[in-house]
Amino acid sequence: MSQQLDTSRRHSWLRIIRLLPVAGPVTIVAAALNLLIGLLPLGFVIGTSVAVDRVAGTGRGIWAGVGLAVVSLLLQAVLSPFQAAFTELISRRVDAACARRLMRATLTEAPIDRLEQPDLLDRMGDARRGLVEYSATPGAAVAGLIALIARYVQLAGGVVLTGMVLGPVAALVITAAALVARFGERGAQTRYSVLRSRSAAARRKAYYVLDTGSSTAAAKEIRMLGTLPWWRQRADRDSDSYLRPLWRARRRIRLAPFTAYSLVVLAGALAVLIMLRDAAGRGDLSVLGLSLGLQAILIPLRFGVYFPEADSQTQDGMRAYESILAIERAAGQRSPDRRRPGGPAGPVPVRGIAFEKVSFSYPGRGRNVLRELDLELPAGTSTAIVGLNGAGKTTLVKLLSKLYEPTAGRISVDGTGLGEFDARSWQRRLAVIYQDYVRYELDAAANVWLGAPGQMADSEALQRAIEWAGAAEVIATLPEGLATVLSSRYSGGVDLSGGQWQRIALARALFAVQAGASVLVLDEPTAQLDVRAEVAFFDRFLELTRGLTTVVISHRFSTVRRADRIVVLDGGRITEQGSHEELMAAGGQYAGLFELQARRFA
């Protein structure tokens, strides 16, 4: 265990050092500034010692000592704001670079199935939290490392002054005492940090309960159901489950080791003080030497304390950075089909897309969601995929989007396996709205043009997409039109209803079509619209997108009757397919469910 901690500690320091170039040349200036700040306390010690010596003597030269001490104090006061400014600048630059790395790994590189696994969810929680908590960011770790320069310069200066007054033996003893104290303090911090990282799952549970119980999103339901006492009890229980083991471990880690290294430091300090007393008793020391020796000894003895400008920053900040590295490692474990950055661009389907004996099961689950599925999506036609909840409809969309790879079988475009194409370029060929589409807390315009950010300057395409989606009325009601932020959490912002949000999300997908996407996939696009509005939307939508390869997922059979072809999915397999008229004439599952739903909405 001890060897593992030592190895982990060395690796952490190396990782911090490798981040130094990210901040740029400002690190050199900050290092020089901390070097100077580290020398200033030594100047104060020398200045006061000279002043005391002159007072005890003739008094001549006293002002030189006083002047050196005063200048040292003033420079510390003057330079401290600059030190803080450089610390902030370095932290921001490094954190910005780390945030970009985290976003790249999670949003473009890491497999979705890997990101959904509990160990990586814990890592992502630590990384995100670390990037927003000032004292725990990777940038703070880099700035904290530079701040340690001042501390070690003070230590070196104190040791040198001790050696000049009492000789090399005293210098070695005081150095050993200081380093024992320092390594004892840092070792305890490292062991505690390791234990905290191992409790990530318990921490995630505790934070979830606390966040949910204190959030506005859950406030209405908590009040109406009167569940606040339960949330309080659950928060106490989960917090105790997370914190109590850490408190016990902290006492175990801190108490005995602190006692041990404190005794070592005390012994070293007593030994050096005895040397100082003996030298003074023999008359070997002047007043200058005695004053200098007393103050110089105290500098290393203060080295075993907690350094507020560096210790938690380097320890906790590196935990966040190590979480980012873990996510990047997961991103490097992509399946062979996803490692094709140099592969051909995704084509515009000419003949169509085919699912060939495709099976799929989510990682960690034994049951296949799709089982040897064969499906043709002819180019330029609209295909509706219907089925009850849990039939595998959304999973099919995820496979088509290359967010997941089939467990067995393959998906092809015009006869070429989808795995042969570059994933990103293929995804740009698709305009997709998922069931759980994102409600961006941005202005309305951004919520639409994020469907194709490269075309954000095309205002005409933006307006067409809004009109096609039936969102023009929504925009007209907003106080600032397209410039209105779609969240009441911001001044002047507005919350939208579920149906209004759905129209905005549809506009986003249709804007991607305007920008060149050739396959449009809508997963339950109108689930929050009433039946009449849904039918009207589909009638208009299928008319506007005629000639485009369109896939519409729905559990309402009555709303997709105008699609060129309807596919019924049940238990991960296709049970029926054909036009609405053909399926009704067949009198099978589709016809039965269509009539059942029609009676419910009659």
Region spans (language model):
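C-terminal portion of ABC ATPase nucleotide-binding domains
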Residues: 539, 547, 555-602
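Extended non-transmembrane interhelical loops and adjacent amphipathic helices
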Residues: 1-14, 92-139, 202-211, 215-245, ...
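ABC ATPase nucleotide-binding domain helical subdomain, centered on the C-loop/LSGGQ "ABC signature"
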Residues: 410-412, 445-491, 547, 585
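Transmembrane helix-loop-helix hairpins at lipid-water interfaces of multipass membrane proteins
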Residues: 25-82, 152, 156, 163-189, ...
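Membrane-integrated ABC transporters
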Residues: 1-41, 64, 122-157, 241-244, ...
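Cytosolic ends of transmembrane helices, especially the final helix of ABC transmembrane type-1 domains
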Residues: 293-330
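An intracellular "coupling" helix at the cytosolic face of ABC transporter transmembrane type-1 domains
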Residues: 21-25, 128-141, 223-267, 313-316, ...
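ABC-fold ATPase nucleotide-binding domain signature/coupling loops
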Residues: 472-504, 508-525, 529, 600
